[in-house]
Amino acid sequence: MKYSAGDFDVVVIGAGHAGCEAALASARMGCKTLICTMNLDSIALMACNPNIGGTAKGHLVREIDALGGEMGINIDHTFIQSRMLNTSKGPAVHSLRAQADKKRYSERMKHLLEKEDNVVLRQLEVIEIDVEDNEVKGVLTKNGAYFTTKAIILCTGTYLKGKIIIGDIIYSSGPSGLYPANDLSQSLLDLGINLRRFKTGTPARINKRSVDFSKMIEQPGDEKIVPFSFIHNKLDKDQISCYLTYTSEETHKIIHENIHRSPLYNGSIEGVGPRYCPSIEDKIVRFPDKDKHQIFIEPEGENTEELYVGGMSSSLPEDVQIKMYRSVPGLENAEILRTAYAIEYDCIDPQQLDLTLEFKNINGLYGAGQFNGSSGYEEAAAQGLIAGINAVLKIKEKNPLILKRSDAYIGVLIDDLVTKGTNEPYRMMTSRAEYRLLLRQDNADLRLTELGYKVGLVKEDRYNKFLNRKKNVENEIERLRNMQITGKREINEFLLEKGSTELKKPISLYELIKRPELDYFKVESLDDKRPSLSDDEKEEINIIAKYEGYINKQLEQVEQFKKYEDRLIPKSINYLDIKGLRLEAIQKLEKIKPINIGQASRISGVSPADISVLLIYMERKNREN
């Protein structure tokens, strides 16, 4: 029996990492928000790896935080180990990664939603999206409750017609044994939304007491803990170690002998899996020259004996899994607590969305996270945040927030999904960003906090803290530029001691820092007027000084491409009217409906010649008007 259950500005379907950010953004920007989840105990669930961040993903978390999102703050409160990755490389690829207490991470996020003034949190299954005249009107739940709304954000994760696969055992399920959402897919199909099947998987969880750590390499956390959130200056924590081991010859033998029983190779799995996170059986088949693969043993929390076996995702039958895991050094007596599995689910072709993450053909309907064809908690949270922000901005009749590729990794992520599309679960990587030296994790606040403040997510106290940090960095760089160092005997002795050359003429301290063998920290003894600065401010100053030449080159590239990004394409344009455009280009441009020339130029199948034709047509139309 259908009944009227209430009216909301925004309804968020799903309370995973995308849904939580979407709901909190919507509520904190002043909109009455309903967030529906299949299970209140699975909010912000880490259904796979128990960590946040990593290469490129750490950048996304910093950007979410800079815009006023919650993920960085939440992991800072609930981490059990922290490490900075890629420290032997340049600052563009330095990435923070934190091991999470997954239960506490979920509980804290749930509590935030419960406490948020404008949020109503409900355990409900949405089965139908109500649309009239291409505009959302409401949602219907399995219990008959009908909620009217102005905007709907779909954050369904892997629940949409979810199907668990373990060998020849196949059954309908969401992740981690939770209920799937089997009815909503049909409603989306009825609305003309194109769905497809993707696949992901997760390794087994084992009991800590059954593991022999003496056969493994310990991986402790960093001594100096760097917070994810810019609001935290310092974090102290007793950390829990992870451990590294490897597959053995026996592991590979077991997999080869049972490969015919793998759903990946016998046709049981239809969905496309993630290229950059293959199962262990896939790795061994695809890389036969490798005699061993890394396996990471990761704790799932402080108050559990469960360990995550990173690098051994599998969908092999359970009997094969037991033998396979026990063939790994240190896991000879491993007790499996949760079996590894693959999961198939419905998701969309993200080319049906525009850069705000709203469907092109349905006003007020947005998508975020794995529903959009991405993989990963961080990618999901980033999209949820942007979808939440844009849903509210549209309701308030304000301009949308569209991040460019030169603004943020979030801009790269969304542009890739919407403009290029994806045929497999999309994972963020530093190599996807053209301007990665500008998009470092250390300067995410300098790039994005102003935007977060303008949309209303960054509050006054945090904004003032940001302005203070920005001023400190700018003032110190200016001071360094103006401070002259001369070739005094003691200074030249210091330089020779550091393996540098003597000064023949006065030089600014800023220029001196640029020498390969020196940096901001090493020249402190030459600088008796140095102000008191935080560690992150010092690091920011050092990077700006050391990499100024490279940074300026990338800024010049951004300016060159800016003319294309700023050249807006009229919404009323009819590509069929443009003589000289190839048929493929017309079809792609009609489908994706790029908002500017820059986006049009990145569409697969649209050539530079097509862009020239389009520009000439637009110039002619401008003159006529």
From Swiss-Prot:
The keyword tRNA-binding does not apply. One of its GO terms (molecular function) is flavin adenine dinucleotide binding. One of its GO terms (cellular component) is cytosol. GO terms for biological process: tRNA methylation; tRNA wobble uridine modification. NAD(+) binds at residues 273-287. It is found in: Cytoplasm. It comes from the Bacteria. FAD binds at G14, A15, G16, H17, A18, G19. Its cofactor is FAD. Gene3D superfamilies: FAD/NAD(P)-binding domain, GidA associated domain, C-terminal subdomain, tRNA uridine 5-carboxymethylaminomethyl modification enzyme MnmG/GidA. InterPro entries: FAD/NAD-bd_sf (IPR036188), GIDA_C_N (IPR049312), MnmG (IPR004416), MnmG-rel (IPR002218), MnmG-rel_CS (IPR020595), MnmG_C (IPR026904), MnmG_C_subdom (IPR047001), MnmG_C_subdom_sf (IPR044920). Keywords: Cytoplasm, FAD, Flavoprotein, NAD, tRNA processing. HAMAP family: MnmG_GidA. NAD-binding protein involved in the addition of a carboxymethylaminomethyl (cmnm) group at the wobble position (U34) of certain tRNAs, forming tRNA-cmnm(5)s(2)U34. Belongs to the MnmG family. Homodimer. Heterotetramer of two MnmE and two MnmG subunits. This is tRNA uridine 5-carboxymethylaminomethyl modification enzyme MnmG. It comes from Clostridium botulinum (strain Hall / ATCC 3502 / NCTC 13319 / Type A).
